[in-house]
Amino acid sequence: MKKLLFFWSEIKTSFWFIPSLLILSAVIAAWVMIFIDHQIDIEIEGIFSFMFTSSADSARSVLSIISGAMIGVAGTVFSITLVALTLASSNFGSRLIRNFMYEKINQIVLGAYISSFIYCLIVLNVIKETDTTVFIPSLSVLFAIILTIINIFLLVIFIHHIAVSIQSDKVVSDIAESLSHNVKVLFPEEMGEDFEVEKEPTLPTEYYNFTYNVKSNKSGYLQYIDDNKIFDFANKNNLIVKLDCRPGDYLVQGVNIARVFSKDELEDSSLNIFKSAFITGKSRTPQQDAEFAIHQMVEIAARALSPGVNDPYTAIACIDNLTTTMCYLSKVKFPSPYRYNDNKELRLIASVLDFEGMLNAAFNQIRQFAKDSPSVVIRLMESLKVVYYYTDKDEYKMAVKMHAEMILRLAEKTFIEKNDLIDLKQRSEFIY
């Protein structure tokens, strides 16, 4: 079931999903309006003469103009989108194209123009004027005019949205919002339940005579693990499963992804069940990958610190948003990797993230790229100071202190101005 939900989530976030729905809606709306026109005979006189077309030629003319304009504007919208994607790719990184493509407003506008074009074609096809038969779908033509007016407003909204969306502050804000959402969804609801153990449990290998290595079917990024499927099968067959990877890891075909401990010999079909619980693709996805949005934010900061861009303010904005995330993570209870059944029997050992790993993902690369930018290094120390103050766990404080030490060592080697180094050390005093 979780695998189906993953595929459904991927479909919903695809670029063609909303346009396809709008096109289908346009086809249905066209036939509904044509049916209504067949059932209702409108007398075109008085004030109605200004609202409805009175001849087949005028109806065809209106629909032809609208359909031509809609497909032309659809091409313009597509071109504007490509230009925005090009700018985003060059300034913020190609991996951020996913965020621009999957924005709902882009899909709605493109789908609205294409669906209006298809609607006009269908209605245009049913207009008839012969010696014996005359059918002018006046309501359908009026509805096409209303759609055109709506699409004009959509075009204005779309242009405004594109102009705003390529600004660095907006990009950082959107990534921060996505990061906050992903973190709150995945933590504490991560693989592995909150089962308190004093130390790592010892695998009862003396009771499990057979050990099987589950290997990856293909190379690619691990996008999803159906942990419930693995747990249920392990519990049903009295197995212990240890996962050697987590979503976001890159897998090479044939590499071990899990180990299965069994009392009895297992058939190949049983191992295939485990393989089917792993979904591998060409790119990383945010569904279960907690570091995905963090790496997107880090990529923006890294590009901002590159010699060709040299934009420390964008890097500082990224650091500030990452600080908010790390402060949140310092308060959540990270899940245990050990999952037990109702009888407290170990069934699944997951590969889970911890606070130190998330802290490394957030600040390591930025520190490395910021060696020639004292202002960014100082802001990094200020961020660590905030995280250190925010957390009350000793192991988290030690992880923050380790990063502060690395920043100080970097500054001692790269800072030219002594006052900058003094300023940095003053900010680190709270941590030490």
Predicted features by range, described:
Residues 1-432:
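Well-ordered secondary-structure scaffolds
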